[in-house]
Design a protein with these regions (language model features):
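Short glycine/proline-enriched loop/turn "hinge" motifs that connect secondary-structure elements
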Residues: 15, 101, 143-144, 201-207, ...
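A common structural junction motif
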Residues: 91-92, 241-245, 338-346
């Protein structure tokens, strides 16, 4: 039996410890509302730092503001401190919108039917657990690495990273410098017949928030004809957004692999919507992803307006989420909005560019190493990877900007149904099988890339 297999067997023997760590992390309510003071990431970081100290592993905490720490851990037993592999995650979680709808305590870390439930159990404390345990178990076994292995778990990922990886990039870019990095945003299995493929997160759509101000003229509600009700203009704006026909595009690498999903036709802008409809019946997740990756989306999310119930509203604000493809910059978005609303009078909008589109090349040593590591983790000869662009955004954009090849890959187990994860939703959860396979994958990846001897 080779050294790596012995280490993977130790992971199997450590399932109880892996599960307990995940539960402890979920029980810390590191909720990020996006409005300061918020986050509470420091409580998570302090817990982990104390745990690592007992293992003889030092950690560093850095923050822009108190309570919002970022965790930095360097694997201690290395020959060269030059960072080869960066393991990325985040400690903040989104709020629980309606706790009464939850079957399980959102911050209880309860176990049922082989799953751990709670806010952040999947996004992103499961990945953090797997990465931490891979480091801890290697260190206990005295594994020496030729090149550096670093873990960074950032604050504020759920609201743009301005207290997390974004702040670290501005102030400590050297910490984010590595040849390769692995983060959330991929590693989801897609079963097609008897074959299993995995989506590898090679890039991300851009994200903008647009605040649309719709202006009218106030009046008393008993004499509404004396005013101009901005609510009616809002209705027009919403109808325009609902019926918006974005430009179609099939140039992303993902569409070059559609034959894996049984699509025989060459994908083009002319047939993509027809193929999406066909895929919806047999592979709904692939269908949804194909739709997201072939167009820009504009989604109304927040409406604010009116000051009293007996007054005609003079002004209404509509906030929309916009997701863009790689070639669609801020100028493109403004041009699209101008065309969309050209017949609406008294309307203004401000754009906040949260994340630019970003990507890493698919053909790299990191891709090959992930494929090999995860195949070893789940006990198969090989796995097929498909390059995927995320319709969401993660902290990967900061490391890519810093010159690091970065992929999203969590190492989910093929038996763990991703639909049950319910990320950001009610009863969010992670399969214990994925916690274990993720830990094995992170360990095998570090062992391979950092040239363990």
């Amino acid at each position: 039996m080779d050294k790596l297999q012995k280490l993977l067997n130790i992971v199997d023997d450590s399932v109880e410890e892996i599960v307990e760590l995940e539960q402890e992390l979920v029980r810390i309510p590191s909720i990020n509302t996006g409005v300061m003071p918020t986050g509470n990431e420091s409580e998570v970081c302090d817990f982990i730092s104390d745990m690592l100290n007992k293992e003889g592993i030092k950690s560093k905490l850095l923050h822009r503001d108190p309570g919002r720490d970022n965790l930095i851990v360097d694997y201690p037993n290395v020959i060269s401190t030059e960072c080869k592999l960066l393991l990325m995650s985040h400690t903040d979680v989104v709020p629980v919108e309606n706790e009464s709808k939850w079957k399980y305590d959102p911050f209880g870390g309860e176990i049922s039917s082989g799953r751990i439930y709670g806010r952040g159990s999947n996004d992103c404390k499961s990945l953090l657990t797997s990465q931490l345990m891979s480091m801890i178990l290697m260190n206990r076994e005295g594994v020496k690495l030729d090149k550096g292995l670093r873990l960074i778990s950032g604050a504020d990922e759920e609201h743009g990273g301005r207290w997390g990886f974004g702040w670290l990039l501005e102030n400590y870019p050297e910490l984010l410098k590595a040849e390769y990095a692995v983060n959330e945003g991929g590693g989801i299995p897609v079963e097609i017949g008897e074959k299993i493929y995995y989506l590898l997160g090679t890039g991300e759509k851009g994200r903008l928030e647009v605040e649309i101000t719709i202006k009218g003229e106030s009046a008393h509600a008993s004499l509404p004809w004396l005013g101009v009700n901005s609510s009616y203009k809002l209705s027009q704006v919403l109808d325009l957004i609902k019926n918006y026909q974005p430009k179609l595009d099939t140039s992303l690498p993902f569409f070059q692999y559609m034959d894996y999903f049984g699509v025989e036709e060459k994908i083009s802008t002319k047939n993509i919507d027809q193929i999406i409809k066909i895929l919806e019946q047999k592979l709904p997740r692939v269908s949804h992803l194909s739709k997201a990756l072939s167009r820009m989306t504009i989604t109304p999310t927040i409406i604010e307006g009116g000051i009293k119930s007996n007054s005609v509203p003079e002004k209404i604000k509509l906030i929309c989420d916009i997701r863009t493809l790689p070639f669609q910059d801020e100028k493109y978005v403004i041009e699209e909005l101008d065309k969309l609303f050209d017949k609406i009078e008294e309307i203004d909008y401000e754009i906040d560019y949260m994340s630019v589109p970003n990507y890493s090349s698919f053909d790299t040593k990191l891709k090959d190493s992930i494929s090999k590591a995860h195949a070893k983790s789940i006990g198969v000869d090989e796995i097929k990877l498909i390059p995927s662009t995320s319709n969401g955004f993660t902290d990967s954009r900061f490391t890519r900007e810093n010159g690091t090849i970065t992929y999203g890959f969590s190492g989910a187990h093929p038996d763990d149904d991703p639909i049950l994860a319910n990320v950001h939703g009610t009863d969010e959860s992670i399969g214990i099988s994925s916690l274990v396979s993720g830990t094995k994958t992170m360990l095998a990846l570090a062992y391979d890339l950092c040239n363990s001897e």
